[in-house]
Curated annotation (Swiss-Prot):
It is found in: Cytoplasm. InterPro entries: Exosome_RNA_bind1/RRP40/RRP4, KH_dom_type_1, KH_dom_type_1_sf, NA-bd_OB-fold, Rrp4, RRP4_S1, S1_domain. Belongs to the RRP4 family. It comes from the Archaea. GO terms for molecular function: poly(A) binding. GO terms for biological process: CUT catabolic process; exonucleolytic trimming to generate mature 3'-end of 5.8S rRNA from tricistronic rRNA transcript (SSU-rRNA, 5.8S rRNA, LSU-rRNA); poly(A)-dependent snoRNA 3'-end processing; RNA catabolic process; U4 snRNA 3'-end processing. Non-catalytic component of the exosome, which is a complex involved in RNA degradation. Increases the RNA binding and the efficiency of RNA degradation. Confers strong poly(A) specificity to the exosome. Keywords: Cytoplasm, Exosome, RNA-binding. Gene3D superfamilies: K Homology domain, type 1 (3.30.1370.10), Nucleic acid-binding proteins (2.40.50.140). GO terms for cellular component: cytoplasm; exosome (RNase complex). This is Exosome complex component Rrp4.
């Protein structure tokens, strides 16, 4: 174990930590309660990293907020997360959904339909079958029972078109970027509609197969280079080069 240099409000660069690294964090730095799970508090200012991650900062209301971006790990559901799931089993009144996690989730027919459901008079398989893809939100999560999904919100429900790809769930933050900078750039450069689930699944709806292929290449490049700096601009240049190579553009204005 070795100790990283002290982190202060003036720190602007990302810092890579691995399990066991000791990090000095000023008390005036705000730490997200959900991300404090990744850091073991040794004393008032000293934390021990429990994972491989990037430590980064963002300014919110004149305060410095610490962001912990895991680089390894599986998806653990959190209430409010948007996830992209695949139906893997059907019961009389619910679907069992694989959300790319150690936990299978449940989507109740009454929630999906927005009304009461009677399995004696209605066939649940009319609505969703094994293999169907669903965008849902984690409504509740109890580790002893697993997460419950809801689709009662705008943009949620069965996916009827597009392509589905997967990345490591802990790389999702890099695909989205600060204030959605990376995601907005991907959408602008590829003209694809891109939906990123917190569980590492992504749905692409693109104008043509070539732009879809470029978008997939770019996302996979982000995944493999998530630990590096200057990534957004590098990915933008990569997409432009790929479009030129395929004759989609001659030059970039």
């Amino acid at each position: 174990m070795y100790e990283k240099e002290a982190i202060s409000l003036q720190t602007s660069k990302r810092i890579l930590v691995v399990p066991g690294d000791s990090v000095q964090i000023s008390q005036d730095v705000v730490i997200d309660p959900q991300q404090i799970l990744y850091l073991y508090k040794k004393d008032d200012n000293t934390f021990i990293s429990t994972i491989t991650a990037l430590l980064d900062f963002e300014n919110i209301d004149d305060k410095k907020k610490l962001r912990v971006i895991p680089l390894k790990g599986r998806y653990i559901p959190r209430e409010g997360d948007i996830v992209i799931g695949i139906v893997v089993d059907v019961t009389l009144s619910s679907w069992i959904i694989d959300i790319n996690s150690p936990y299978l989730s449940v989507l109740n027919a009454s929630d999906y339909l927005g009304r009461s459901f009677n399995p004696l008079t209605d066939n649940i398989r009319k609505y969703l079958e094994i293999g169907d893809v669903v965008v849902g939100k984690i409504a509740t999560f109890d580790r002893s029972r697993g997460p419950i999904l809801t689709v009662q919100d705008k943009g949620l429900g069965k996916v009827v078109d597009g392509s589905l790809i997967e990345i490591e769930p802990i790389k999702v933050a890099r695909v989205i970027g600060k204030k959605k900078s990376m995601l907005n750039m991907l959408i602008e450069q590829t003209k694809c509609d891109i939906l990123v689930g917190n569980n590492g699944r992504i749905i692409l709806r693109c104008p043509n197969p070539e732009l879809e292929y470029i978008a997939i290449l770019a996302i996979k490049k982000i995944e493999s280079e998530a630990h590096t700096t200057g990534l957004t601009e590098r990915i933008r240049e990569f997409i432009i080069e790929e479009k030129v190579k395929r004759g989609l553009i001659k030059y970039e204005v």
